[in-house]
């Protein structure tokens, strides 16, 4: 689960992480009030959407204008910048060409920036540990730094038994070239960041840039936080921060029904049980010249109703021109899948090619249900056969 920058900063601040003062605004009047309270003389007006690259982004109605993060020097300019952002669609590298509508603004006090650094904590699969990633190249995408200047990145893996210690934090501070009281400030910053990460079951916290001010303060000028969805049941206060308007409506609906769904840009819908099999299914669709329209894992204990819901989710995408159902019945029974597919196809008046590959528990019964349904369903014997058939059927129907 993702949250907005202002929400991330509010959470981190509770753990002693230093952030600039600021306030969220939904209207021009609220933006003016926040700016007056902060006092100036410099303010930063930031669009709040679930995507990075806001500063370099452009608004659809003003592609040659300024981006979604603006530094201003008067309260009137705060209001004018807010007016130029609210209700407008911001396009960044991460939003895709469709962009995201800006529905709230974060007005923040300006900072006397002397250095920009990068700092994050994440779960490192290679070490199975929480790992600090830091770099002197702040303000840039860390992937770009890793590609062009990998020597400028330092990583520190944290032993889960020991936890983050002061010497870990000082090692990072020294690697970033911090001196004097900056080292102590960075140490406090990191210890608070780690406590927030572990207490709130985060999967990522990224501060880019982490800045050193003229007075030696170490501040989070931006903050991005992701949470482990599987741990949200322990954090109802975090769930309340969810902004469903920033998420795909179909993905939100899928979550409500216990489905794992991610919308993609292709035209062949996929319904599979198991994340690994789902990824393999998408790969083989591409191998045969098609493009998957989604990732959809119905799980191992799906009911007929859940399968029907999954089918409707796929068909809710207007770009879907064909569907491939690929089920290996271990825990899942093939006859349950078949019942769900038939029920959904009848309910939505199926109008696109459908290929079903079943294998495993009750496979013969499942195939019988499909064959006797009277629906134009193509049966496949294996995964390659299924992918080849759906790609061919979609091309012929075009």
From Swiss-Prot:
Catalytic activity: succinate + ATP + CoA = succinyl-CoA + ADP + phosphate; GTP + succinate + CoA = succinyl-CoA + GDP + phosphate
Residues annotated to bind Mg(2+): 208, 222
Alphabetic keyword roster: ATP-binding, Ligase, Magnesium, Metal-binding, Nucleotide-binding, Tricarboxylic acid cycle
Cofactor: how bound: Binds 1 Mg(2+) ion per subunit.
Statement: the UniProt record of this protein carries the keyword Methyltransferase: no
Residues at which substrate binds: 273, 330-332
Record's GO cellular component terms: cytosol; succinate-CoA ligase complex
Entry GO MF terms: ATP binding; magnesium ion binding; succinate-CoA ligase (ADP-forming) activity; succinate-CoA ligase (GDP-forming) activity
Family annotation (PROSITE patterns): ATP_GRASP, SUCCINYL_COA_LIG_3
Pathway: Carbohydrate metabolism; tricarboxylic acid cycle; succinate from succinyl-CoA (ligase route): step 1/1
InterPro entries: ATP-grasp (IPR011761), ATP-grasp_succ-CoA_synth-type (IPR013650), ATP_grasp_subdomain_1 (IPR013815), Succ-CoA_synthase_bsu_CS (IPR017866), SUCC_ACL_C (IPR005811), Succ_CoA_ligase-like_bsu (IPR005809), Succinyl-CoA_synth-like (IPR016102)
Enzyme class: ligase
GO BP, one annotated term: succinyl-CoA metabolic process
Chain sites annotated for binding ATP: 46, 53-55, 108, 111, 116
Pfam families (alphabetical): ATP-grasp_2, Ligase_CoA
NCBIfam families named in the record: PRK00696.1, sucCoAbeta
SUBUNIT field: Heterotetramer of two alpha and two beta subunits.
Protein family per UniProt: Belongs to the succinate/malate CoA ligase beta subunit family.
Function per UniProt: Succinyl-CoA synthetase functions in the citric acid cycle (TCA), coupling the hydrolysis of succinyl-CoA to the synthesis of either ATP or GTP and thus represents the only step of substrate-level phosphorylation in the TCA. The beta subunit provides nucleotide specificity of the enzyme and binds the substrate succinate, while the binding sites for coenzyme A and phosphate are found in the alpha subunit.
Protein name as catalogued: Succinate--CoA ligase [ADP-forming] subunit beta
Taxon lineage: Bacteria, Pseudomonadati, Pseudomonadota, Alphaproteobacteria, Rhodospirillales
